[in-house]
Amino acid sequence: MRVADFSFDLPDELIARYPMAQRNASRLLTLDGNSGALGDKQFTDLLGMINPGDLMVFNNTRVIPARMFGQKASGGKLEILVERMLDDKRILAHVRSSKSPKVDSFILLDGGYQMKMVARHDTLFELELLSELTILEVLEAVGHMPLPPYIDRPDEDADKERYQTVYNQNPGAVAAPTAGLHFDDAMLDALKAKDVNIAFVTLHVGAGTFQPVRVDTILEHKMHSEWANVPQDVVDLIAQTKAAGKRVVAVGTTSVRSLESAARASQGELKAFSGDTDIFIYPGYQFQVVDAMVTNFHLPESTLIMLVSAFAGFDHVMAAYQHAIAQKYRFFSYGDAMFVTKKAH
């Protein structure tokens, strides 16, 4: 398939630049993967669609304030966007400046912290913090929330809370697992009260999630890698859920990629997984674990719309997006959501 097959025209006013006043106040478009049938709902209607005994899997990564500003020794301004933390002192990062910093040069961050440019890895820079503090402590002090480029505004104080799920736990993401932004504590409690099981995996979403696909055909695309963890207790819960004939519902494409990465690595019976994954899911992929998913509306030609198309069928998904545009759903990270069931192969 060609990347251009996943293109669609989106009116600019449908890009959500701010979240709704309440997390669960979004709209929800339902898509039946088998029939292609659509339903226009409110997000809170999801409660009625998840059955007792179903397992919902959330990504509990925490977004770090990954954007920092500073200057080179020459005085030239630069912007640093963390791609991933390597340890307490070192990061891999995207650096924007008029000229790339040289190896062994120094960077002065806002707030007076200093970093050294240690190495270059393709388009990424390895930077080392020269401080008693950890990278996380410096990010908390001077970092900005890394809002996606299409939100097209500076980050505000409210984003520190709203570009973060209520159940976040493990710091390391530089983009939010956005399907989870719709859930508040009351909704999680209501799911538990209904005997829906809840489990958590971790995938630290990288800035690569916003990188456009720059090739003509899908098979040419090289997927960025991200760190994921699927613990044994989640594997056990999945086995129990499947044995009882119930569904595994993944909240977000990152949860889908975590679970399917574990399945790919174990080649058959699902096992716990911890490590880097570069799984690229596109039409033709056979899903091993996930039966239904909650997901936001994704960018045209992105690997994420390809994943949803693999799940519910290309024609069904592209038709759903045209419906969403006609019905003025809000798109992307701060936008509305979909509840999608898997198309049988």
From Swiss-Prot:
Its main location: cytoplasm. Keywords: Cytoplasm, Queuosine biosynthesis, S-adenosyl-L-methionine, Transferase. One of its GO terms (cellular component) is cytoplasm. Disulfide bonds: none annotated. GO terms for biological process: queuosine biosynthetic process; tRNA wobble guanine modification. GO terms for molecular function: S-adenosylmethionine:tRNA ribosyltransferase-isomerase activity. Its EC number is 2.4.99.17. Coiled coil: none annotated. It catalyses: 7-aminomethyl-7-carbaguanosine(34) in tRNA + S-adenosyl-L-methionine = epoxyqueuosine(34) in tRNA + adenine + L-methionine + 2 H(+). It holds the Pfam family Queuosine_synth. It is found in: Cytoplasm. Pathway: tRNA modification; tRNA-queuosine biosynthesis. Belongs to the QueA family. Transfers and isomerizes the ribose moiety from AdoMet to the 7-aminomethyl group of 7-deazaguanine (preQ1-tRNA) to give epoxyqueuosine (oQ-tRNA). Monomer. This is S-adenosylmethionine:tRNA ribosyltransferase-isomerase. It comes from Shewanella baltica (strain OS155 / ATCC BAA-1091). The gene is queA.
